[in-house]
C-alpha cells in the first residue's frame, strides 16, 4: 500500500482487487437479502436492481453516483424494508452493474433510462422517490414526467442542476477529473474526507473508499461527466407531490443553499436542516434519516394502542447481549432479584438466539418484535478464523446490524410504554441514544463487564488508531450527554478494570470507569453453596462416583469448534493415563454435535441447559476464554484450562486480568498447541490443587438494588 495516502493505512486497511466487488459480496446487505433481484439491459449494458420487503407502499432509491453502490444504503434499506417495499439499483459503472468503457455510455439520459427500465421490470407502479446528491435530479425529473407514478419525493444533499457555465466551476471540474485519473487513491481520500466532516466518521469514510475502489477513477470520471450540464430546474417546478428536502448545514460537497433552492422550486416542499451535518445522512445519521423517511412517506400517525398513564402496568425491557450465554444467565439472575424488590414489575426480553432460546426454556417472555432482530452471533462466527476472532474489527464491522437492531428497538419504544430499559452490553442502544438523545423516553440502565477497546497487535497502527477513535467517541458521548445513562453498572470490582489508557491523549481506563460506573461485584447466575455437595450433584446429573469427569465447552457461538476438535484429538492420550476418565464435549446452542469428532469413549452432547451445574461437579473443564464460564469455574472451585481466542481483546486482556485477581488465570494459547501438549497440560491441571480467591455471591442483588433506585427515582430526596 506504499502508493496509498497515510489515512488508508490508518483507517481503511488492506483493499481487495480494484475495479470490482469483492468475490464474497453476493448481495449488498449482510442482514437482508432481496426478495427478488435481476438485471435490465439497455444498449448492451446490464444494470442490477434489487427489491426488499414484501408489504407496504413502494420506496425507490434513484441509483447512486458511480463512486458508490447500493451497499451505501446498508443502514437504511434493511429497516425501511420492514415497513415498505424498497427498490434499489446499482448505476452503470459500479456495484453489480456493468462497467462499460467510453464516455458515450455515461449520460444523464442513460442513467434515467436505466432507472425507468428497472422500475418497469419490477412492477413499481407508484412510489416514493429518494434522490441522494446528484440523483436528486433523477428523482425530480421522474416526479415531473410521471406524476401518476410518484407519491412523494425526498432529496438528501441534492441539487437541481450541474451546470458548468462558470469558468471557475469548469476549472474545478477539470482538475477533479485529472486527479481521478492520475491518482485515484488520493482522490478517494479527498472526496470522502469532504463528505464526512463529522467527528469519528472513520467507518463511513472507510466504507466510502471501498465503494469507490470497486470502480475506477476513469469510470467515475466518465460517470460524473454524464451528470454535468444536466438541469432539472424547470422540471422541479412541475413536481406536485409532497416533497422533503434533507440537507446538512455543514455539507462541504453540496452547500445547503442548493437544497434550499430545491425547496423554493418545488411547490410546498418542506426542508429538514441537519445542524452540523455533512453530505450523506443515510450513512452518517441513519436513525434520523430512517425516521424522517418513514414518517414522511407514511403520512399518517402510526397505529397501535395508547394506554392511559394510570392504567399502565409497570414494565421493564431487558436487552441482553446474545454473544455467548453468560450475559443472559447473569441478566436473569439480576431480573430475579429485581422482581423481589419490585414484585409488580413486568419484564420483557429483547434478544436473539442463543440467549432467546435460553430465556424461553426458563419461561420468560420475549417480545414478539425480536423476530426482526439481526443476529450478532452469526456475524461473529462469520468473521472468525480458526480459534481466532479479531474482536475489535468484529465490532467495527457490525455497524449494519447495530443500526438495524436499534431501529427495531426504536419502533418498540414508539409503539409501547416502558418504565425502564436495562441494556447488558446493548452497544447499539447506548451508541444511538447518545447520537439521538431526544429519542430517550424512560430511564436507561447500562451494564458491561469490560470498558475500553484495546489493540491486540503491537505493530498494527490501524488497529491502535481506530480503537482510540472509538474510545474517544464513547468518552465524548458520556461527557456531553450524562443523562442518557441513568445508571451505568460495571459487573465486577474496581481492581478488575485495566489501568491501560484508552489511547494517546485519553484518560486511563480505570480512572474513567471509577468516575462513570458503579461496581456491582461479579454477578453469578447461581449460589455456589447449592453445589457444594458434588457427589449428590454428580448422582443427579448421571455421573458415576468413581469417574473422572472432564467437560469441554466453548460457549454460545460456533467459533470454538476447532478447539473441541483438538481436545478430542488429545483425549486418547489422556484416557491412557487416566483410565477412569470420562470426557464430554458440549457443542453448545450454535454448533452441531454432528460436526464434532466421533471416537470410542468420547461423549458428544448438543446444547446442555444450565451447563454450569455440570461444570460445578467436574474434575476438569477445558473451555474457551470467556468471562462467564471461567468465573463460574472459579466460584465452584473447579480445575480448568482456558483457551482465549487469538486477537480477542476482551478475553486476552480484560478477562485474564480479572482471573488473575482471583488467582485463576489458567490460560493457554491455542496457536501451535499440539494434542500431545494439550493432553499433558490437562493431566497436570486435573491433579493440581485449587487455590482461587472466593467469588462474591451478592452481585445480582447489588445490581438489582441499584436498578430499583432508578425506578424509584428518589435518590435526590432529603431524608
Regions found by a protein language model. Name each.
Residues 345-396:
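Conserved nucleotide-sugar phosphate-binding/catalytic loop shared by glycosyltransferases and other
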Residues 448, 454-558, 588-589:
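A nucleotide-sugar donor-handling region in carbohydrate enzymes
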Residues 503, 521-620, 671:
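Donor-nucleotide binding loops and adjacent catalytic segments primarily
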Residues 45-99:
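Conserved HGGG/HGGXW glycine-rich cap/lid loop of the alpha/beta-hydrolase fold
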Residues 164-170, 179-235:
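Conserved alpha/beta-hydrolase catalytic His-Asp/Glu region
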Residues 140, 144-145, 150-179, 642:
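Flexible "cap/lid" loop of the alpha/beta hydrolase fold
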Residues 239, 245-247, 251:
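Short beta-strand/loop motif that positions the catalytic acidic residue
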Residues 88-130, 134, 291:
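Active-site loop/oxyanion-hole signature of alpha/beta-hydrolase fold enzymes
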Amino acid at each position: 500500500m506504499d502508493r496509498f495516502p497515510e489515512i488508508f493505512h490508518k483507517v481503511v486497511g488492506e483493499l481487495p482487487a480494484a475495479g470490482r466487488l469483492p468475490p464474497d459480496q453476493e448481495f449488498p446487505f449482510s442482514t437482508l437479502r432481496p426478495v427478488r433481484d435481476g438485471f435490465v439491459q439497455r444498449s448492451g449494458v446490464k444494470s442490477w436492481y434489487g427489491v426488499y420487503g414484501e408489504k407496504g407502499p413502494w420506496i425507490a432509491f434513484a441509483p447512486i453516483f458511480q463512486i458508490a453502490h447500493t451497499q451505501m444504503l446498508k443502514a437504511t434499506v434493511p429497516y425501511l424494508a420492514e415497513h415498505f417495499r424498497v427498490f434499489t439499483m446499482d448505476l452503470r459503472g459500479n456495484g453489480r452493474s456493468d462497467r462499460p468503457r467510453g464516455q458515450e455510455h455515461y449520460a444523464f439520459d442513460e442513467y434515467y433510462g436505466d432507472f425507468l427500465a428497472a422500475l418497469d421490470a419490477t412492477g413499481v407502479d407508484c412510489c416514493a422517490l429518494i434522490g441522494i446528491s446528484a440523483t436528486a435530479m433523477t428523482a425530480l425529473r421522474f416526479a415531473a414526467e410521471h406524476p401518476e407514478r410518484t407519491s412523494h419525493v425526498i432529496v438528501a444533499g441534492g441539487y437541481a442542476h450541474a451546470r458548468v457555465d462558470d469558468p471557475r466551476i469548469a476549472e474545478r471540474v477539470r482538475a477533479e477529473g485529472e486527479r481521478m485519473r492520475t491518482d485515484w487513491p488520493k482522490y478517494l481520500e479527498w472526496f470522502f474526507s469532504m463528505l464526512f466532516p463529522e467527528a469519528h466518521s472513520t467507518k463511513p469514510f472507510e466504507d466510502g473508499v471501498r465503494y469507490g475502489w470497486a470502480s475506477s477513477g476513469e469510470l467515475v470520471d466518465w460517470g460524473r461527466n454524464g451528470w454535468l450540464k444536466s438541469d432539472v430546474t424547470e422540471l422541479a417546478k412541475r413536481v406536485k407531490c409532497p416533497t422533503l428536502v434533507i440537507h446538512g448545514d455543514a455539507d462541504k460537497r453540496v452547500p445547503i443553499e442548493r437544497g434550499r433552492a430545491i425547496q423554493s422550486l418545488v411547490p410546498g416542499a418542506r426542508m429538514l436542516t441537519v445542524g452540523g451535518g455533512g453530505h450523506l445522512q443515510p450513512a452518517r445519521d441513519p436513525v434520523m434519516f430512517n425516521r424522517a423517511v418513514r414518517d414522511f412517506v407514511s403520512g399518517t400517525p402510526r397505529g397501535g394502542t395508547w394506554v392511559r398513564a394510570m392504567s399502565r402496568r409497570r414494565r421493564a425491557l431487558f436487552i441482553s447481549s446474545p454473544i455467548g450465554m453468560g450475559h443472559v444467565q447473569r441478566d436473569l439472575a439480576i431480573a430475579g432479584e429485581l422482581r423481589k424488590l419490585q414484585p409488580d414489575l413486568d419484564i420483557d426480553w429483547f434478544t436473539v438466539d442463543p440467549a432467546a432460546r435460553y430465556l424461553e426454556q426458563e419461561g420468560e417472555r420475549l417480545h414478539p418484535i425480536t423476530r426482526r432482530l439481526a443476529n450478532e452471533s452469526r456475524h461473529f462466527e462469520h468473521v472468525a478464523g480458526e480459534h481466532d476472532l479479531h474482536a475489535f474489527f468484529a465490532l467495527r464491522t457490525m455497524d449494519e446490524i447495530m443500526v438495524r437492531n436499534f431501529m427495531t428497538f426504536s419502533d418498540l419504544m414508539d409503539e409501547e410504554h416502558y418504565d425502564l430499559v436495562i441494556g447488558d452490553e446493548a452497544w447499539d442502544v447506548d451508541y444511538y441514544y447518545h447520537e439521538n438523545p431526544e429519542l430517550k423516553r424512560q430511564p436507561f440502565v447500562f451494564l458491561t463487564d469490560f470498558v475500553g477497546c484495546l489493540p491486540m497487535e503491537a505493530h498494527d497502527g490501524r488497529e491502535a488508531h481506530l480503537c482510540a477513535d472509538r474510545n474517544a467517541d464513547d468518552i465524548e458521548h458520556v461527557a456531553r450527554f450524562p443523562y442518557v445513562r441513568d445508571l451505568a453498572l460495571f459487573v465486577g470490582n474496581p481492581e478488575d478494570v485495566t489501568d491501560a489508557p484508552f489511547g494517546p491523549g485519553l484518560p486511563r481506563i480505570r480512572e474513567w470507569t471509577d468516575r462513570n460506573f458503579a461496581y456491582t461485584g461479579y454477578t453469578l447466575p447461581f449460589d455456589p453453596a447449592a453445589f457444594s455437595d458434588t457427589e449428590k450433584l454428580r448422582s443427579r446429573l448421571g455421573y458415576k462416583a468413581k469417574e473422572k469427569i472432564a467437560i469441554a465447552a466453548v460457549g454460545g457461538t460456533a467459533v470454538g469448534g476447532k478447539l473441541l476438535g483438538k481436545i478430542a484429538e488429545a483425549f486418547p492420550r489422556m484416557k491412557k493415563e487416566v483410565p477412569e476418565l470420562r470426557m464430554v464435549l458440549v457443542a453448545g446452542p450454535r454448533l452441531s454435535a454432528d460436526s464434532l469428532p466421533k471416537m470410542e469413549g468420547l461423549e458428544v452432547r448438543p446444547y446442555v441447559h444450565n451447563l454450569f451445574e455440570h461444570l460445578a461437579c467436574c474434575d476438569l473443564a477445558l473451555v474457551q476464554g470467556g468471562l462467564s464460564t471461567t468465573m463460574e469455574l472459579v466460584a465452584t472451585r473447579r480445575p480448568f484450562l482456558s483457551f482465549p481466542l487469538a486477537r480477542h481483546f476482551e478475553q486476552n486482556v480484560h478477562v485474564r486480568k480479572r482471573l488473575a485477581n482471583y488467582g485463576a488465570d489458567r490460560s493457554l494459547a491455542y496457536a501451535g498447541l499440539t494434542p500431545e501438549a494439550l493432553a499433558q497440560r490437562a493431566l497436570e491441571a486435573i491433579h493440581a490443587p485449587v487455590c482461587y480467591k472466593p467469588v462474591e455471591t451478592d452481585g445480582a442483588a447489588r445490581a438489582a438494588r441499584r436498578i430499583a433506585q432508578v425506578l424509584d427515582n428518589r435518590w435526590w430526596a432529603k431524608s
